[in-house]
From Swiss-Prot:
Signal peptide: none annotated. It comes from Bos taurus. Residues 1-31, 244-266 are annotated as: Disordered. This is Transmembrane protein 268. The keyword Transmembrane helix applies. One of its GO terms (cellular component) is plasma membrane.
């Protein structure tokens, strides 16, 4: 089983499905042609690693070399720890495996079998006349419920995922000034779960300017709506606390154990949960930058998987059918959409 990142000799990822309408990834490992310029939404490179191996790490050195062929100087040390700590923790890797499409399909199959068996066993308590007609009705009922579950799964995948997309906030915040966005997707090849880290070029200056103007306008005319939407942009985080932080000297003497700890015994650190705001109140320019950093990974995932909502017009993209990040944030994050956009 190969546990090395799957890269081609030029440093870019191997062949990947990229069928998003209106854009096409640049050839990996090939320098830009004469007069060719990078366009917003262009895929620069993709790193692929086998999620079933341990330990694993992204070959960010190869990504750095690939970005240099496009004239983008981004030292890997600026975001290495941010990207790897966000995506390669054991609990995150397990979540990616259990949230993969084959696992959802397997769950749907098990759900269908269980529902069919329960409905059929219940129907035997009543006289339904023709046996085959009863079996057909049971099958139709189980199929409709399973299809409903599949639709729920698909709608769930179109929302911003706090366990993957939003964990790239710090890394994207460091890469915004380099005009690069990171996004993560997963796929299954054979029996291997593969994590794909996408590097996408995007000039976000105009998007940041539009969002700052939009936030400034909302503060003057729709402040209650702005506060309501931003209050939903929060995550629950666990932080370590010191048990002696809020205790005085007299309490320390009372709490001191009389017997020494047993050798080799380790006490679990005290943890507390806190609700952290993703976009705190600040100047409109700072809030706009933070919104782009928070939802940059979400936008990139929708872009490379062709799941972005169709737009009648675009502000800062070459394709008229693909919305730019500020359009997505304006409509689905700061807008009046009633459906939640974060998955917990």
């Amino acid at each position: 089983m190969a546990c090395e990142p799957q890269m081609d000799p030029g440093g870019a990822a191997g062949p990947l499905p990229t069928s998003s309408p209106g854009w096409s990834p640049l050839p990996g490992g090939s320098p830009p042609g004469w007069g060719q310029e990078l366009r917003s939404g262009q895929v620069l490179t993709v790193l692929r690693i086998d999620n079933t191996c341990a330990p694993i790490s992204f070959d960010l050195g190869a990504a750095e070399e690939q970005l240099q062929t496009w004239g983008i100087q981004v030292p890997a040390d600026q975001y290495r720890s941010l990207a790897e700590s966000a995506l390669l923790e054991p609990q995150v890797r397990r979540y990616i495996i259990y949230n993969s499409r084959p696992m959802r399909l397997a769950f749907a199959v098990v759900f269908y079998v269980v529902v069919w068996a329960n409905i059929y066993s219940t129907s035997q308590m009543f006289a339904l006349g023709n046996h085959w007609a009863g079996v057909l009705l049971v099958t139709l009922a189980a199929t409709s419920l399973t299809l409903t579950l599949v639709v729920i799964f698909e709608r769930h995948q179109r929302k911003a995922n706090t366990n993957t997309d939003l964990r790239l906030t710090a890394a994207n915040g460091a890469l915004l000034r380099h005009r690069v966005l990171l996004g993560v997707t997963d796929t299954v090849e054979g029996c291997q779960s593969v994590i794909q880290l996408w590097f996408v070029y995007f000039d976000l200056e105009t998007c940041a300017q539009f969002l700052s103007d939009h936030i400034r306008e909302m503060k003057m005319s729709q402040e209650s709506l702005l506060r309501s939407r931003l209050s939903q942009l929060c995550v629950v985080m666990e932080t370590g606390v010191s048990p002696t932080a809020n205790e005085g000297p007299e309490n320390l003497l009372e709490e001191t154990p009389l017997l020494p700890d047993r050798p080799g015994s380790t006490e679990k650190p005290l943890m507390q949960t806190e609700l952290r705001q993703l976009v705190p109140e600040a100047e409109p320019e700072e809030m706009a930058q933070q919104l782009l950093a928070v939802f940059g990974g979400y936008y990139t995932r929708l872009l490379v998987t062709s799941q972005l909502p169709q737009a009648l017009g675009t502000r800062h993209m070459d394709s008229p059918r693909i919305p730019c990040p500020c359009q997505l944030i304006e409509a689905y994050i700061l807008g009046t959409e009633c459906c939640p956009f974060l998955t917990r």
